[in-house]
Regions:
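Basic side chains
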Residues: 12-13, 105
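Small/flexible residues
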Residues: 14-15, 124
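Intrinsic disorder/low-complexity segments
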Residues: 9-11, 27, 31
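Bacterial N-terminal signal peptides
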Residues: 16-26
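A structural boundary/capping signal
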Residues: 29-192
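N-terminal secretory signal peptides that target proteins for export/translocation
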Residues: 1-11
Length: 192
């Protein structure tokens, strides 16, 4: 008769390795998401002051918004000192020069771009990095040249979405006009 002894410590290491492998395989889904339409988000109450910015009509006959213009506007907003405020600031309050947070700067850029005729623009609330503890706000702009990430709080210019990396700018919620979205990993959608 042969007796086999299983060391409990080795079993714990096996389960730790197994859970680590599952966790690392899930990391690859960051940055790849599908936006699902929703009726409400946790931010609806806070955003009541700036809802009109998101739902404003884009003026007809405006000049095309260039990447150079957007980079200038990002630089202007980036130079405003950072200061967190729970309440969302209006674009006018942000332009006053008093400290503004990522929400205020993103909404001010959204407003300025829309006034000048930009379309296919989304306000995103999500994580700046996969390990961020707090949420962050930025814009995504779809153009014929690709999707741009516009973050006037962190960056001095626009970056193409493919250049920011898979572990950066991870959306949780998106707002485009009157439409609201919840981000879901693309891998979950592929399984259904």
């Amino acid at each position: 008769m042969i007796f086999i002894s299983i060391n409990p410590f080795a079993l714990k290491r096996f389960f730790f390795f197994f859970l680590a492998a599952i966790g690392l395989s899930c990391v690859s889904c960051f940055g790849q998401c599908v936006l699902l339409g929703v009726k409400t988000t946790p931010y609806d109450g806070q955003m009541s002051r700036i809802r009109w910015v998101l739902t404003a009509d884009v003026p007809e006959g405006r000049d095309k918004v260039s990447l150079g213009m957007v980079n200038r506007w990002i630089g202007d907003l980036r130079s405003i000192p950072y200061g967190f405020k729970k309440e969302w600031k209006t674009p006018t309050e942000t332009q006053s020069g008093s400290p503004a947070d990522c929400k205020a700067k993103a909404v001010a850029l959204y407003d300025r771009m829309q006034i000048h005729g930009a379309t296919n623009l989304r306000l995103i609330v999500g994580k700046r990095t996969a390990t961020s503890r707090s949420t962050h706000a930025w814009l995504e702009w779809d153009t014929p040249n690709g999707t741009y990430v516009l973050d006037p709080t962190i960056n001095w210019k626009a970056y193409q979405g493919r250049d920011v990396g898979r572990r950066s700018y991870i959306p949780l919620y998106a707002f485009e006009g009157t439409r609201k979205f919840r981000a879901a990993p693309a891998t979950l959608m592929a399984q259904n």
